[in-house]
């Protein structure tokens, strides 16, 4: 099982576009893509009871439809309920419902900042709208800064593809790469070469 987590600095940062790029560039993994959101989209007809909806139609209308259009094997929208007496989403309950539905060889891409605290991904990519060589970054989601501590690399839109090998400098950590992409939907050769060895084989059970 390979797991990629893609988070972002804010809404509209390009998380979905990057996930579509990953799905298209790595089709042999037959990805199951899961968007985790705190917004109740109210989908009807879900094959799961509760907060998980499976998208079945590829298209451009929703993020999950875009996953399928990019080549994902399956796509889900997960809307976790808040934990009792708190406003924090109960990601543990959603994941506990999700995992048993799949074989051990299923490969997952998650779109979420918070899920990185609940899974052990092969790769965690954080998308930032403006590439910065060092912290502090501009004010962004608190969940972004928490997830950034787990990032293996930063991805940022740019006018051209460029790798900054030591571009992400976090206190107490070794410098990590920043991949600047001219189009988030199209992985640069450098990003593809960097990510493949971290995922392992794409065999399915």
Annotated model-derived regions:
Residues 2-6, 31, 106-110:
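Generic beta-sheet signal
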Residues 3, 31-33, 74-77, 124, ...:
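Conserved beta-strand scaffold positions in the cores of enzyme catalytic domains, especially
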Residues 4-22:
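Glycine-rich phosphate-binding P-loop
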Residues 19-26, 139-143:
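Histidine-anchored nucleotide/phosphate-binding helix
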Residues 23-85:
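N-terminal phosphate/diphosphate-binding loop that engages ATP/GTP or pyrophosphate donors
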Residues 73-104:
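Active-site rim loops that border cofactor/substrate pockets in soluble metabolic enzymes
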Residues 96-100, 104-107, 112-194, 198:
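Conserved catalytic-core segment of NTP-binding enzymes
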């Amino acid at each position: 099982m390979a797991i990629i987590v893609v988070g972002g600095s804010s809404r509209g940062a390009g998380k979905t576009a990057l996930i579509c790029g990953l799905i298209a560039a790595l089709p042999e993994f037959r990805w199951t893509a899961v968007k985790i959101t705190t917004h109740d989209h109210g989908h009807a007809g879900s094959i799961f009871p509760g907060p998980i909806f499976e998208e079945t139609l590829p298209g451009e209308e929703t993020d999950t439809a875009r996953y399928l259009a990019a080549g994902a094997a399956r796509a889900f929208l997960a809307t976790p309920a808040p934990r009792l007496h708190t406003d924090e989403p109960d990601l543990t309950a959603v994941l506990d419902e999700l995992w048993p539905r799949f074989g051990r060889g299923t490969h997952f891409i998650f779109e979420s900042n918070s899920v990185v605290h609940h899974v052990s991904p092969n790769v965690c990519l954080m998308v930032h709208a403006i590439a910065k060589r060092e912290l502090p970054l501009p004010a962004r989601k608190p969940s972004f800064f928490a997830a950034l501590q787990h990032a293996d690399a930063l991805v940022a839109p740019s006018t051209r593809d460029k790798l900054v090998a030591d571009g992400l400098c976090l206190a107490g950590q070794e410098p990590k790469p920043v991949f600047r992409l001219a189009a988030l939907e199209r992985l640069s050769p450098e990003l593809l070469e960097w990510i493949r060895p971290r995922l392992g084989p794409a065999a399915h059970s």
